[in-house]
């Protein structure tokens, strides 16, 4: 135990440059890192935008970007998705880009997007 205390005393006498070189040499010799470990609890408790930015989006808007060559099939798909009448669905398709569905779950948004893409439309999830 006395040898450990003596070693600590000797390390305490090192300059910052020498201490940095000692840390680097120990990292190289033993294959370890002196960087502090980050625990999930500490990261979650830390205030800031990083944790919020990594949260997964839960609500999506499905936007019809372009109609494509198969306009009639896209109108049919829009009618079946939205429940709109023929005239309203045609106006929506003609006015693209338009949001077809707002604030829907990821699964529903993907289902709607697939249906529109299969009809020939260009779609974007926001």
Curated annotation (Swiss-Prot):
<dbReference type="GO" id="GO:0003729">
    <property type="term" value="F:mRNA binding"/>
</dbReference>
<dbReference type="Pfam" id="PF00542">
    <property type="entry name" value="Ribosomal_L12"/>
</dbReference>
<dbReference type="InterPro" id="IPR000206">
    <property type="entry name" value="Ribosomal_bL12"/>
</dbReference>
<keyword id="KW-0687">Ribonucleoprotein</keyword>
<protein>
    <recommendedName>
        <fullName>Large ribosomal subunit protein bL12</fullName>
    </recommendedName>
</protein>
<keyword id="KW-0689">Ribosomal protein</keyword>
<dbReference type="GO" id="GO:0003735">
    <property type="term" value="F:structural constituent of ribosome"/>
</dbReference>
<dbReference type="InterPro" id="IPR036235">
    <property type="entry name" value="Ribosomal_bL12_oligo_N_sf"/>
</dbReference>
<dbReference type="GO" id="GO:0022625">
    <property type="term" value="C:cytosolic large ribosomal subunit"/>
</dbReference>
<dbReference type="Pfam" id="PF16320">
    <property type="entry name" value="Ribosomal_L12_N"/>
</dbReference>
<dbReference type="GO" id="GO:0006412">
    <property type="term" value="P:translation"/>
</dbReference>
<comment type="similarity">
    <text>Belongs to the bacterial ribosomal protein bL12 family.</text>
</comment>
<comment type="function">
    <text>Forms part of the ribosomal stalk which helps the ribosome interact with GTP-bound translation factors. Is thus essential for accurate translation.</text>
</comment>
<comment type="subunit">
    <text>Homodimer. Part of the ribosomal stalk of the 50S ribosomal subunit. Forms a multimeric L10(L12)X complex, where L10 forms an elongated spine to which 2 to 4 L12 dimers bind in a sequential fashion. Binds GTP-bound translation factors.</text>
</comment>
<dbReference type="InterPro" id="IPR013823">
    <property type="entry name" value="Ribosomal_bL12_C"/>
</dbReference>
<dbReference type="InterPro" id="IPR008932">
    <property type="entry name" value="Ribosomal_bL12_oligo"/>
</dbReference>
<dbReference type="InterPro" id="IPR014719">
    <property type="entry name" value="Ribosomal_bL12_C/ClpS-like"/>
</dbReference>
